[in-house]
Amino acid sequence: MHSLFTLNLDLERAGKVICAQSLPFDTARETLLLLSPVGTQCCYMKNAALFLISHFNLIILESDTWLAYANEAGVNPEEGVADFIRQFNAALPEPVRVDALVGYCSSAPLALLAANQGACRTLLLLNGAYFLKDDGVIKSQYERDVERMMQSIPQGNCAQVYEAVSLLHTQSTYTPSDYRYQQVRPLRELSAFRQYLTFLNNLASLELVRIAQAVKTPTLVWCGSQDRYTDTASSRYIAQLLPHSELVEDPDGQHHDFVDGHERLYLTMTRFLTRHKQRAIQ
């Protein structure tokens, strides 16, 4: 019976990093590195983890940990992100090696950049939030609202914006033990909100068009037509840029399917990974 346990890693420059890891480790299984979206903790992924650990070795890493290093490394965000994943892979205990990288929502740009650094053999991008600068790409109202909030960092009015949106947190009925509580976690206090928007701005500064075009890794791009948070146009656009991509658009798909236990998505992921594992063996 596989379960999730705490994994402590000591990275050369980033220092101590705390993740979640499924045990016992099975060398016959592929190892997935799952990135939680910006502003969320590992527990946000528990429904997905319950399914995935029955098929794969699993490591869950919080995007905030990664971006905190990239933000303080004294280099541009792209170089900081790339440096972190190199340290992370070097710190993994033998014989653990990342086979597939999973980016969901705002962690998709991180996963994309890591894949460009050769961090995985297969890549899965699920309902990605890419913050594309191309005005020709349709964006949802939610994406436009978030981008306006992101502007409060360079404009210096983050505190005023926080006061306006923090009511969403106070009106939330989710308890901290409920994984859905993570959706409004950045609204608990001003410092968390400022960090959340700073990290999103770092992601928005990445040259994703150039990065996607350079990714050689086979990639599954999954999006849901009923997603009210991220418009499928961004996922379709990224899929067109990737040299080796498979685009799946679920006509009934919702944004939170990955964390809500949507079996159709999990089976699509499993089939994709199994197919490419067989090709690698051949």
Swiss-Prot record:
It catalyses: holo-[CmaD peptidyl-carrier protein] + L-alloisoleucyl-[CmaA peptidyl-carrier protein] = L-alloisoleucyl-[CmaD peptidyl-carrier protein] + holo-[CmaA peptidyl-carrier protein]. The gene is cmaE. Keywords: Acyltransferase, Plasmid, Transferase. The active site is at C105 (acyl-thioester intermediate). GO terms for molecular function: acyltransferase activity. It comes from Pseudomonas savastanoi pv. glycinea (Pseudomonas syringae pv. glycinea). It is an enzyme of class 2 (transferase). The keyword ATP-binding does not apply. This is L-allo-isoleucyltransferase. Belongs to the AB hydrolase superfamily. In vitro, is able to accept L-Phe as a substrate when presented on CmaD and is able to load this aminoacyl moiety onto heterologous T domains. Thus, CmaE should be useful for shuttling different aminoacyl groups between T domains existing within heterologous nonribosomal peptide-synthetase (NRPS) assembly lines to generate natural product-like derivatives.
